[in-house]
Amino acid sequence: MSIAARLIKSLPAAGLMLACAAACAPRAHAEVSVFKIDIGLPNTVAVMVRGDFSGNEILRFKSAIAEIDPGKRIIAILDSPGGDVVQGEALGRFFWDARIPTMVLGGTLCASACTYAFLGGRNPTTGNPLRILALGAKLGFHRFRPDGMPERAYTKAELENVSRETQQIVYRNLQHLIYVHASLDVLKLNTGTVNEQVNFITEGDALNYGIAVLDAQTGNLVLPDNIDQRTRKGDQ
């Protein structure tokens, strides 16, 4: 049985324990805490990142896992409304490089910059993408705009500068998605919104973006692979 299958088989109880632990974690900023929970995989440790990304979450995460036996696998549990995009990207790339799966538990949130981290999840055995969204979890995207943009009339030169900055943001987003092998369709979720609004996707939609969906009550994990193959065949 694969690491993913064994993990999911044990998640009904593990998810409840993680949820209880999460309820006690501080929300002031993204505090990295290590939850050593028995989920049927004695060589696996769950690490939670919770709260706003304030600027050094990647350091906190690396500091946390530095204390964990290198022989143990790690699962990143995310619960954040967003914050510093640079930190989200850094976490996502590290998750991908270190083959760390990501998960958002039911009743919790991963939005804005947090999605950059979430999309870096990777199967430690196969090396394929592994991002898990539990039923009842919220995953949200929105468009980022250049800083310092008050509502006022702008000159042509200013608008051209804003256009260049926006293109750079989109390009940077694209490069991140390519790095972590995420669906490029995610760009539509970002560019199709205004920066003040968050576009939350359903569990069914998540499968279209290469995200696995977990029913923690039954332990059933719906993988996007076969659905993606059927969709591709339909496009041919």
Predicted regions and their residues:
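C-terminal segment of classical bacterial N-terminal signal peptides
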Residues: 18-27
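Charged, glycine-interspersed solvent-exposed loop segments at helix/strand-loop junctions
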Residues: 142-235
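Short, glycine-/small-residue-enriched flexible loop/hinge segments at domain edges that mediate gating
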Residues: 71-87, 101-109
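Membrane-embedded segments
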Residues: 85-92, 96
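Small-residue-centered hinge/linker elements
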Residues: 28-73, 79-83, 127-185
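Glycine-rich beta-to-alpha active-site loop
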Residues: 96-146
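Terminal peptide-recognition signature
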Residues: 49, 76, 118, 206
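Bacterial N-terminal signal peptides that target proteins for export
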Residues: 2-15
